[in-house]
């Protein structure tokens, strides 16, 4: 999508579809301004009792001949309450109102109380992301008439700087959405490795794929235990972005890569949504999407290592048993008291490997626990961190990306719930505080001197009904936060 700032007055703008946001109480004033160009606007507002309330929308076809072909007025609610999230929601609504029109979408919102760069970026991201639709698996995809260009009306020319990362960031989100949404007979461990190979080729990154024998040689017993019930070979993926010039910061992004999770012998039953366990590789999709964006944006001075331990968790005669004891790459022995808590086993070896790269900070993303969904719902991810500066940076990055993120406690006293009679630790603790003990388990495989954060995306990885910038389905959650975090350190 072509993105630009327009200095043209809204009354003179001549694109294909014009969307104007109206705060509550403002419609009459705006209507007077628009009336000279679009006769009948005032009467239409009165007939529809349009007051500018949040969610109100009025679609007009004001000009019999010429552009714009469509004029859309959307209500924004109280003017004092229009924050950046309100701008984002309004831009998403504008995008939906533009469906059916090709050409250029013009958007005017009350930008004045916001930094121009920020307003431009979030508006453009919201428009592109909310127009996304996945029709790859349909015999006859519906033809969609969509805008090919977006002009933000009324922002200063300097706001164009905010548009520069938008298309690259959104492309990363879209890649993550495609990976999460695709069924597990399409997205396999090998398919994730192929995706990484394509990124390495397209953006000049370095790629290492460890096969089963390589992982055995490195002692990755936790990861391999999860994989042994599947006929599909595991893939351990290490993708590296190296900037031109000196490296000031080295970062690691680790994603959980379970391309299908049956639960193993602790089989998912009842309301466990086994049919949706294709999204258990959502963490790997997020880090792959982030690497796609980073590869295009090329942040200076920041080296980024992406690590994904990918496999399936299946049931056969070779599958891991409840009660088995396995050994991670650092020699830690783990009693598997629940085969459906497999993600943390794969992440244990992935985190150990990531820390071997001597990063300044490690962030892992995983659809790890239902407990986090119960606590925070499906619009927010929870995160745990051992470092205040990293936590603050992630909060800032998530806020800028419009992704809900809430810090959770790393309460050390809960670690006793992971104590095993026979091994160094168990892979699950008691049900209460389950997301906390999961984070404490992961922390055991992070170097003590390494800043680390674990983000549990089990809730926001998928949206059943869609909301805001996310159509129904895979959301691509985490990509914007990661891209913002990495680029902020350039």
From Swiss-Prot:
Catalytic activity entry: Release of an N-terminal amino acid, Xaa-|-Yaa-, in which Xaa is preferably Leu, but may be other amino acids including Pro although not Arg or Lys, and Yaa may be Pro. Amino acid amides and methyl esters are also readily hydrolyzed, but rates on arylamides are exceedingly low; Release of an N-terminal amino acid, preferentially leucine, but not glutamic or aspartic acids
InterPro entries, alphabetized: Leucine_aapep/pepB, Macro_dom-like, Peptidase_M17_C, Peptidase_M17_leu_NH2_pept, Peptidase_M17_N
Gene Ontology annotations for the cellular component aspect, listed alphabetically: cytoplasm
Essential cofactor(s): Mn(2+)
Binding residue positions for Mn(2+) 1: 261, 340, 342
Keyword annotations of the record: Aminopeptidase, Cytoplasm, Hydrolase, Manganese, Metal-binding, Protease
Residues binding Mn(2+) 2, per UniProt: 256, 261, 280, 342
Enzyme Commission numbers on file: 3.4.11.1, 3.4.11.10
Subcellular location: Cytoplasm
GO molecular function: manganese ion binding; metalloaminopeptidase activity
Cofactor, free-text remark: Binds 2 manganese ions per subunit.
Pfam families assigned to the protein according to its UniProt record, in alphabetical order: Peptidase_M17, Peptidase_M17_N
One Gene Ontology term from the biological process aspect of the record: proteolysis
Catalytic residues (positions): 268, 344
Role description: Presumably involved in the processing and regular turnover of intracellular proteins. Catalyzes the removal of unsubstituted N-terminal amino acids from various peptides.
Family: Belongs to the peptidase M17 family.
Protein name in UniProt: Probable cytosol aminopeptidase
Gene coding for it: pepA
């Amino acid at each position: 999508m072509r993105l630009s700032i327009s200095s043209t007055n809204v009354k003179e703008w001549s694109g294909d579809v014009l969307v104007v946001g109206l705060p509550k109480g403002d419609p009459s004033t705006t209507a007077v301004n628009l009336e000279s160009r679009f006769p009948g606007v005032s009467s239409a507002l009165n007939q529809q009792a349009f007051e500018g309330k949040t969610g109100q929308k009025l679609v007009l076809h004001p000009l019999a001949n010429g552009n714009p072909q469509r004029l859309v007025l959307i209500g924004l609610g109280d003017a004092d309450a229009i924050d950046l999230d309100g701008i984002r929601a309004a831009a998403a609504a504008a995008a939906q109102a533009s469906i059916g029109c090709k050409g250029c979408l013009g958007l005017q919102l009350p930008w004045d109380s916001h930094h121009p760069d920020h307003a431009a970026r979030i508006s453009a991201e919201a428009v592109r992301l909310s127009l996304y639709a996945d029709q790859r698996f349909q015999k006859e995809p519906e033809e969609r008439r969509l805008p090919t260009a977006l002009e933000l009306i009324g922002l200063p020319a300097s706001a164009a700087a905010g548009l520069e990362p938008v298309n690259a960031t959104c492309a990363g989100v879209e890649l993550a959405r495609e990976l999460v949404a695709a069924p597990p007979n399409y997205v396999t461990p090998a398919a994730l490795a192929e995706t990484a190979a394509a990124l390495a080729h397209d953006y000049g990154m370095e790629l290492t794929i460890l096969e089963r024998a390589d992982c055995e040689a490195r002692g990755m017993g936790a990861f391999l235990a999860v994989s042994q019930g599947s006929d599909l070979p595991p893939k351990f993926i290490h993708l590296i972005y190296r900037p031109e010039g000196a490296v000031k910061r080295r970062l690691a992004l680790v994603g959980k890569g379970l391309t299908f999770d049956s639960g193993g012998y602790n089989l998912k039953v009842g309301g466990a949504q086994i049919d949706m366990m294709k999204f258990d590789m959502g963490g790997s999709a997020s880090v792959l999407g982030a690497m796609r964006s980073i590869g295009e944006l090329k942040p200076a001075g920041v080296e980024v290592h992406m690590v994904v331990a990918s496999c399936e968790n299946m049931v056969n005669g070779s599958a891991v048993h409840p009660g088995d004891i396995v050994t991670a790459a650092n020699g830690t022995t783990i009693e598997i008291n629940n085969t459906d808590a497999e993600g943390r086993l794969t992440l244990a070896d992935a985190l150990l490997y990531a820390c071997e790269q001597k990063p300044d900070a490690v962030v892992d993303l995983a659809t790890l626990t239902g407990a986090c969904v119960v606590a925070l719902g499906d619009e927010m991810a929870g995160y745990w961190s051992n470092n205040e500066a990293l936590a603050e940076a992630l909060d800032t990055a998530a806020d800028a990306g419009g992704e809900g993120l809430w810090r959770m406690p790393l309460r050390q006293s809960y670690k006793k719930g992971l104590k095993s009679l026979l091994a160094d630790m168990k892979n699950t603790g008691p049900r209460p505080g389950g997301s906390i003990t999961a984070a404490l388990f992961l922390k055991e495989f992070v170097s003590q001197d390494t800043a680390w954060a674990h983000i549990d995306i089990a809730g926001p990885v998928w949206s059943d009904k869609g909301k805001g910038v996310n159509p129904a389905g895979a959301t691509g959650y985490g990509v914007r936060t990661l891209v913002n975090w990495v680029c902020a350190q350039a």
